[in-house]
Amino acid sequence: MEHLEHKKEKRNERAAIQLGLFLVGLLLFGTVAGGQLTGKEKNGKEKAAIQTSGGVSDAVEPKKIALTFDDGPHPVYTKILLDGLAERGAKASFFVTGENAEKYPELILRMQKEGHLIGNHTYSHIQLTSNNREAFRQELISTNEVLKEITGADPIFVRPPYGSWDKGFEQELNMFPVLWTIDPLDWCSQSSTNVEKRILSKARENAIILLHDEYASSIEAALFIVDELQSQGYVFVTVEEIMLVS
C-alpha cells in the first residue's frame, strides 16, 4: 500500500509540475490553441505594434512611379523643372532631341549629375514610317553621338516619337524603346489643372507618365504631381527601375 501511495504522490507531483510549466508557457509565449499566438508570432505582432506606435510604419516597399519628359531640354522650363525635382528629391527620365542637346549641353550635364536618366528622342523629332527607316536610324545614331560627347556615356533607352518603332533597332543599335502608360496630352492643354487631374486619375504603381518639358503648364503640373503622389507614398524613380520590375 505504501508503495502504491508513493507512486500516486509521484504522479500527482509530475502532473503539478507539467501544469505549472504549461501555465508559465501561456504567460510567456502564448499558445496556438484557441487561435492564440505562438511566442514567435506574438513577438512579431508586438514588434509591428511598437513600430507603428513609435511612428515607424511596417516594412512596406514604397510604390514606384516614373516621370518622363520629351522634346527638351528647354533653356527656361527644363531648368525650373530640375530645380523643383531637386528640392523634392525626385528622379525623372529625359528623352531629349539631339539638336536641343547640342544647344544646351549644360542642362544635359546637370541631368546626369543629379541622377536623372537621359534617353534618345531622335535628332529632330522624326517619326518612323515605312519609307524612312534608314533616316530614322541615322537620327538615333547622331543623337547618341551628341549625348556621348556631352556625358561620356552611350544611351540605351529611346523614346520613339509618336511611339513608332522597329524592333530590329534593338539588335542593330543595342537600344530599347520606352513607351508610356499615362498620357495626359499636356502638349495640347494650357491648363495645368487638367493635366494634373488626368494623371492622378490613372496613377498606379510602376506607371510611366509622359510629359513635355517645353511648356510652363507641364512643369507646373509635374511638380504638383510629385508633391501629391509623394504624400500618398509614391517614390519617383528613373524609368529604368520600372522596366526592371516589368
Residue ranges, per PLM feature:
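Active-site beta->alpha N-cap acidic-glycine motif
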Residues: 43-131, 135-136, 142, 146, ...
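Catalytic domains of cell-wall/extracellular-matrix polysaccharide-remodeling enzymes
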Residues: 80, 126-235, 240-246
